[in-house]
């Protein structure tokens, strides 16, 4: 249905206005709910485009690379689907960032496709610990 319908065009980043001028880490994720969960629970700056299919303009890529020492791509782990679209789109985003970004993924053992699901399934403290462990690329 229309649950997540909005009038934003594909160039709008969710969470952009909350980003610091610079920082150690940035997480690019798939949805506003994950941006909010990451920012609230981990205090890690996070942003999301309107969909996993959208790619940022090269000027934005260069700006983010200059502002953040490490950029992580945390898209959905569609572990329960025949084709893991989140993994494929995450890999494409890493390539779009000229391999400056690192793709991380919530392990299948958690049965959680995204960070907000992980928080719901194992709790905020455990989810934050799991995220720290994820920053070693899979």
What annotation goes with each model-predicted range?
Residues 1-67, 85:
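Phosphate-handling DNA/RNA-contact segment within nucleic-acid enzymes
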Residues 26, 70-72, 102-103:
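A structural signal for isolated positions on well-ordered beta-strands in alpha/beta enzyme cores
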Residues 33, 53-56, 75-90, 108-110:
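Acidic, metal-coordinating catalytic cores used for nucleic-acid/nucleotide bond scission
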Residues 44-45, 91-104:
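Structural alpha-beta junctions
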Residues 64-77:
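A structural-propensity feature for long, helix-poor, extended segments
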Residues 88-96, 114, 118:
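Alpha-helical scaffold elements adjacent to nucleotide-binding pockets in ATP/GTP-utilizing enzyme cores
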Residues 110-138:
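Short, small/acidic-rich helices and loops at N termini and domain boundaries
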